[in-house]
Amino acid sequence: MAKQPTRARKRVRKQVADGVAHIHASFNNTIVTITDRQGNALSWATAGGSGFRGSRKSTPFAAQVAAERCGEMAKEYGVKNLEVMVKGPGPGRESTIRALNAAGFRITNIVDATPIPHNGCRPPKKRRV
């Protein structure tokens, strides 16, 4: 006897009003992740995944494009207010925040959560160009 096809229900997107934008800005790339208050990821984008390769990945414009892409995906969840947490010394720190603001999000507060060692690991040797 033929098995009746089971109907796959359309997955309902949860609606989240407040979110947290985690920005990891390294010297080589910028990663933008938007989560809910509990830390569950809603959307993410990187400068490398946005079509920039090599040294163009580490530009403020690449970080801006990544933030815009991440913001578009987060808007599908109904995110309106963002708390921004920035980590790292990279060139995409400020442009990412500006792009999220221009995308229509209300930024409630900005936190610099860059990890600072209490004299932990030895840093890389200085470059000789």
UniProtKB/Swiss-Prot annotation:
Q: Report whether Nucleotide-binding shows up as a keyword of the record.
A: no
Extract one GO molecular function annotation from the record: structural constituent of ribosome
How is this protein annotated for GO cellular component? Answer: ribonucleoprotein complex; ribosome
The UniProt record lists the keyword rRNA-binding:
yes
Matching PROSITE patterns, A to Z? RIBOSOMAL_S11
Instruction: Report the SS bond pairs.
Output: none
Query: What processes in GO biological process is this protein linked to?
Result: translation
Keywords noted in UniProt: Ribonucleoprotein, Ribosomal protein, RNA-binding, rRNA-binding
> Which family would the database say this protein is a member of?
Belongs to the universal ribosomal protein uS11 family.
Q: What is the recorded function of this protein according to its Swiss-Prot or TrEMBL entry?
A: Located on the platform of the 30S subunit, it bridges several disparate RNA helices of the 16S rRNA. Forms part of the Shine-Dalgarno cleft in the 70S ribosome.
Subunit comment? Part of the 30S ribosomal subunit. Interacts with proteins S7 and S18. Binds to IF-3.
NCBIfam families attached to this UniProt entry:
PRK05309.1, uS11_bact
Q: What is this protein called?
A: Small ribosomal subunit protein uS11
This protein's species is Photobacterium profundum (strain SS9)
